[in-house]
């Protein structure tokens, strides 16, 4: 999902790149992500951060989508020098998704979907090689609960390190329709990071929720360039 932006950033900065496989992801299963749970997901993220800390003096977290929410939640670690978030999942675009973590949320989702699965629409065969295009709805209830517990002002105001946010937005019709852009911008305003150390950037030509992958957009180079411009400014020395 981050390729090639993460590789190009690491190369330009002379940095190591560590790409972890977080709990429940990247598996071939008969029932994809049926056994996903937030505790295991969180523990795998903390373990990944510990590995990253062994690879260099400072850590820059690059987080896409739900990984952006995870990065924000990890940011209290003093070894993290900056966050770069791409279409971070502060809230899902469809406001009805908040029902997922409520009583009867799973049953409502099954009724709405007509079954037990959420499927990625319009994914190419190549994209299906790297994304899990069909997942059990149970996993979405856990993901929504994670957002409920973590993506709030009390989390954001504690963050004081440099933060870059990139997202797809051109107008009300042409924008990220997987996660909420207004929720991202509200989060940005609530960060404890000084104004000089935080930057938000819309990429109107990205055309997709995933702005960092060659499989989703032809304009990923713009994302790389803006990220590097930001990091070189805020991480001098």
Descriptions of predicted regions:
Residues 24, 202-216:
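Histidine-bearing beta->alpha loop at or near hydrolase active sites
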Residues 27-55:
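Catalytic nucleophile-loop/oxyanion-hole region of alpha/beta-hydrolase
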Residues 128-207, 222-232:
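Serine-hydrolase catalytic core
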Residues 84-95:
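Active-site nucleophile loop of the alpha/beta-hydrolase fold
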Residues 62-67, 71:
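Gly/Ala-rich beta-loop-alpha elbow adjacent to hydrolase catalytic centers
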Residues 21-26, 89:
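Short beta-to-alpha linker loops that shape the active-site pocket of alpha/beta-hydrolase fold enzymes
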Residues 1-14, 19-22:
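Short, surface-exposed "cap/lid" segments of acyl-processing enzymes
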């Amino acid at each position: 999902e981050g390729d090639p932006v993460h590789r190009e950033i690491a190369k330009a900065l002379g940095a190591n790149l560590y790409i972890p496989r977080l709990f429940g992801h990247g598996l071939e299963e008969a029932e994809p992500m049926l056994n996903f749970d937030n505790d295991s997901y969180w523990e795998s993220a903390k373990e990944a951060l510990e590995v990253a800390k062994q690879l260099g003096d400072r850590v820059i977290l690059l987080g896409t989508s739900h990984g952006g929410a995870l990065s924000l939640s990890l940011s209290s670690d003093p070894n993290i020098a900056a966050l770069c978030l791409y279409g971070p999942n502060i809230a899902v675009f469809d406001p009805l998704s908040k029902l997922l973590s409520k009583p009867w949320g799973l049953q409502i989702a099954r009724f709405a979907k007509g079954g037990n699965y959420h499927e990625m629409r319009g994914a190419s065969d190549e994209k299906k090689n790297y994304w899990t295009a069909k997942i059990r709805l149970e996993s979405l209830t856990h993901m929504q609960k994670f957002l409920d517990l973590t993506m709030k002002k009390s989390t954001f105001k504690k963050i004081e390190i440099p933060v870059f946010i990139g997202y797809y937005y051109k107008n009300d019709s042409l924008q990220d329709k997987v996660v909420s852009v207004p929720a991202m911008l509200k989060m940005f305003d609530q960060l404890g990071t000084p104004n000089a150390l935080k930057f938000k950037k819309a990429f109107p030509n990205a055309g997709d929720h995933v702005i960092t992958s060659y499989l989703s957009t032809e304009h990923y180079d713009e994302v790389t360039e803006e990220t590097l411009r930001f990091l070189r400014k805020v991480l001098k020395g």
